[in-house]
From Swiss-Prot:
A Pfam family recorded for this sequence: AP_endonuc_2
Domain of life: Bacteria
Name this polypeptide is given: Uncharacterized protein y4fM
Claim: Cell cycle is one of the keywords in the record: no
InterPro entries referenced in this protein's UniProt entry, alphabetically: IolE/XylAMocC-like, Xyl_isomerase-like_sf, Xyl_isomerase-like_TIM-brl
Keywords: Plasmid
Transmembrane segments: none
Length: 311
């Protein structure tokens, strides 16, 4: 097994640590590197409207560099996922910060969401990450009528138009994630609309393996249809019923088929494991060591599939 291969895992924040935002994350970064990982996906604050100050962005860049890690991706915030450190003190309505929404029809609110997205793009640029992963929320009602489509795409296109130059100037792409609130056909329609309007140096796909298994069990049409736009991955496993976010091979996903499908694209490895350690009873260091062995296994599967295709 080639232990020198690039590997990537998501770094999370664990609010049980009094200073999770610096000492806690720094400790996790050190353990991730000690386990053998070379890259991270930066996830803290991905579910909140928290705006990072310039000093925080620089601090984040520094602690990742000091840990000897590179950043493969940053999870951006769409502003409407009601998670913030305020809510941990006891959820109350005013603590649910969901006002910065780049899909809002209230233009002040949409513009606020654009500012939040630009903030995460700036973080990615500082970290040297090539993309930010973004949730674009759709449902199965989105494509039932032209009116419903316009309700989504009018603010979506305005917001993406507003951030396009910001992204291109910083060499940061937006990777739109495969989610679970609509069927596979409708996510393919979403990507088709986006890719007919925006170039590949701006917008691509984040393939979330667990999410896609839930909406299209045993199939990989998003990779087959839009593999040329694959720029980010969220790799995790489940049993087909819940979004478990397990390590690969701990659920039912067909990793041979998945790695072959990814290998057939121009995706730049490493794969990113989006697998929080709270699914396991292991210590943090033991968890990362186990995850790294599995990450190496998947990287070798992708590399082998590419070698076979080339020969």
């Amino acid at each position: 097994m080639d232990t020198e291969m690039d590997t990537c895992i998501t770094v999370w924040h664990w609010p049980t640590h009094e200073r999770w935002y610096d000492e806690g994350i720094r400790h996790s970064l050190d353990l991730i590197r000690e386990a053998g990982f070379t890259h991270i996906n930066w996830n803290p604050d991905s579910g909140s409207s928290y705006m990072l100050a310039d000093a925080e962005i620089e601090f984040t860049r520094r602690i990742v560099a000091e840990a000897g890690l590179q950043t493969h991706s940053v999870h951006a915030s769409n502003g409407v996922n009601p998670v913030s450190e305020l809510a941990h003190a006891g959820p109350v309505p005013f603590a649910q910060e969901t006002r910065k929404n780049f899909l809002s029809h209230h233009d002040w609110q949409r513009q606020s969401g654009v500012e939040l997205l630009k903030n995460r793009i700036d973080l990615a640029a500082a970290l040297g990450a090539p993309n930010v992963v973004l949730h674009v929320d759709i449902t199965d009602d989105t494509f039932r009528s032209v009116e419903n489509e316009n309700l989504l795409f009018e603010p979506l296109f305005r917001s993406f138009d507003d951030v396009e130059a910001h992204c291109i100037e910083r060499n940061v792409q937006i990777a739109v994630e495969t989610l679970v609130k609509a069927n596979a056909e409708n996510y393919l329609k979403l990507y088709a609309r986006l890719f007919s309007r925006y170039s590949s140096d701006f917008v691509g796909v984040c393939y979330d393996s667990g999410h896609w298994e839930l909406i299209e069990p045993g199939k990989l049409s998003v990779l087959e249809r839009h593999g040329d736009r694959l720029i980010a991955t969220h790799i995790h496993d489940n049993f087909g019923a819940k979004d478990d976010h397990l390590l690969p091979f701990d659920g039912r996903l067909d990793w041979d088929a998945i790695t072959k499908a990814i290998a057939a694209t121009n995706y730049r490895t490493p794969l990113n494991f989006e697998t929080p350690m709270d699914r396991y009873v292991l210590s943090e260091s033991s968890y990362y060591q186990r995850a790294h062995a599995i990450a190496l296994r998947l990287e070798e599967m992708v590399a082998s599939a590419r070698d076979r295709a080339a020969n």
